[in-house]
């Protein structure tokens, strides 16, 4: 059986790392629309514990998860799980595959 890796998204909340499609900033209009659509459809999970949303995580199940942890931090945690350690100044978008 394949072991699933759990990714800490803050305040004791964890998600299955292999099911993540994207980790995006909540500031853009398309992300706000996606969040609103997920809320209407009952697919929005708020894991911010009442704090400001700093990242939006899109899952393979089409759920949208709100986190109070910065996108860069979540990306670094994800990379660490997968054995690709990123430095604080590394942009995950520019990392070689």
UniProtKB/Swiss-Prot annotation:
InterPro entries with a match to the protein in the record: RemA-like
Stored PANTHER family: REGULATORY PROTEIN SSL2874-RELATED, REGULATORY PROTEIN TM_1690-RELATED
HAMAP family linked: RemA
Family of this protein: Belongs to the RemA family.
NCBIfam families tied to this protein: PRK04323.1
Protein name as annotated: Putative regulatory protein Dole_1911
Organism per entry: Desulfosudis oleivorans (strain DSM 6200 / JCM 39069 / Hxd3)
């Amino acid at each position: 059986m394949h072991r699933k890796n759990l990714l800490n998204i803050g305040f004791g909340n964890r998600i299955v790392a292999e099911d993540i499609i994207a980790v995006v900033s909540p500031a853009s209009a398309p992300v706000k629309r996606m969040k609103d659509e997920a809320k209407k459809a009952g697919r929005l999970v708020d894991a911010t514990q009442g704090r400001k949303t700093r990242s939006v995580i899109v899952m393979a199940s089409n759920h949208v998860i709100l986190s109070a942890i910065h996108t860069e931090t979540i990306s670094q945690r994800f990379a660490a799980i997968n054995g690709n350690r990123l430095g604080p100044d590394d942009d995950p978008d520019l990392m070689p595959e």
